Amino acid sequence: DPKIGGVMIMGDRGTGKSTTIRALADLLPEIPVVANDPFNSDPSDPDLMSDEVRQKSGTGAEIPIEFKKVQMVDLPLGATEDRVCGTIDIEKALSEGVKAFEPGLLAKANRGILYVDEVNLLDDHLVDVLLDSAASGWNTVEREGISIRHPARFVLVGSGNPEEGELRPQLLDRFGMHAEIHTVKEPALRVQIVEQRSEFDQNPPTFLEKYNPEQTALQKKIVEAQKLLPEVKLDYDLRVKISEVCSELDVDGLRGDIVTNRAAKALTAYEGRTEVTVDDIRRVITLCLRHRLRKDPLESIDSGYKVEKVFARIFGVELLEDDSSQKNGAGQIKTGVR
């Protein structure tokens, strides 16, 4: 569900964050777009059309359609504002009287994924641009009295190492979900990862071919889940309890409630069911809320564990506590509900 609002992955160096995110591009399905349109306009949804396509659609003219893979666009840390937003060719505009617009990365990312590696090191002026586009879904470029706007609805995906700096709360709140990656401690699993990496380095095409059936099956499962999503139901009592958890944790705004509802439904659809259970909510609520809690420098427990503790009390389930769960927010909850 793109409306969840993307995901932020923070964790130790060398844990495969960037590799995992870039691998998502192969799982993404094809979508219908207007042919030769730089903004990947949707042929049927006016909110996802550029002004030019909308005008053409309004006159009843035939709009050519093609199918393209969902785009994954990398936003480099050193990118300029013009490269991100796009530029207007003033000289051409003055001499020929036409709006000559060179689309930027936001145009390319419309209806796709915008990925920012080391997002916590991103310049403040680029953060402001991202916040503006993520909030409105449109990108506006104004130069010398000429104004151009186009849709910029993208799923924001970021990764970074928390040791290298904190992220601004305004941008952090724009990520629907927040995952923490920790280095694998189990020796057998570490050996398996190293062996698979060596196998890939020796012969990449053979390695990819070996896992292609699993990849295809996963892609098919995601497409089927998208079709099933509108039929998924979340009981009113469960929605009330989700909001109770958010209220108890003093989460600012209502974005936490909305994202948790959407994420629980998306997980249910992914597993081929139409009724959300308590266990579905348990599996997503920490990801949806841990980054929305107010930071308390005197707090000794992890924010993820705090979410789990409040969830267990309000939903009436048993939380199995241990030392490691308090340390990294990976506590287990025994629900007895499926």
Curated annotation (Swiss-Prot):
Q: Which SMART domains match?
A: AAA
Q: What is its EC number?
A: 6.6.1.1
Superkingdom per UniProt: Bacteria
Kindly list the positions annotated as binding ATP.
11-18
Per UniProt, which keywords does this protein have?
A: ATP-binding, Chlorophyll biosynthesis, Ligase, Nucleotide-binding, Photosynthesis
Keyword Acyltransferase assigned to the entry: answer is no
List the Gene Ontology MF annotations in alphabetical order: ATP binding; ATP hydrolysis activity; magnesium chelatase activity
Gene Ontology biological process terms, A to Z: chlorophyll biosynthetic process; photosynthesis
Query: Which cystines does this chain contain?
Result: none
Which pathway does it operate in?
Porphyrin-containing compound metabolism; chlorophyll biosynthesis
The record's catalysed reaction(s) read: protoporphyrin IX + Mg(2+) + ATP + H2O = Mg-protoporphyrin IX + ADP + phosphate + 3 H(+)
The UniProt entry, under InterPro entries, shows: AAA+_ATPase, CHLI-like, ChlI/MoxR_AAA_lid, Mg_chelatase_ATPase-isu, Mg_chelatse_chII-like_cat_dom, P-loop_NTPase
Q: What does the similarity note say? A: Belongs to the Mg-chelatase subunits D/I family.
Main function: Involved in chlorophyll biosynthesis; introduces a magnesium ion into protoporphyrin IX to yield Mg-protoporphyrin IX.
The entry's protein name is: Magnesium-chelatase subunit ChlI
Q: Which organism is it from?
A: Anabaena variabilis
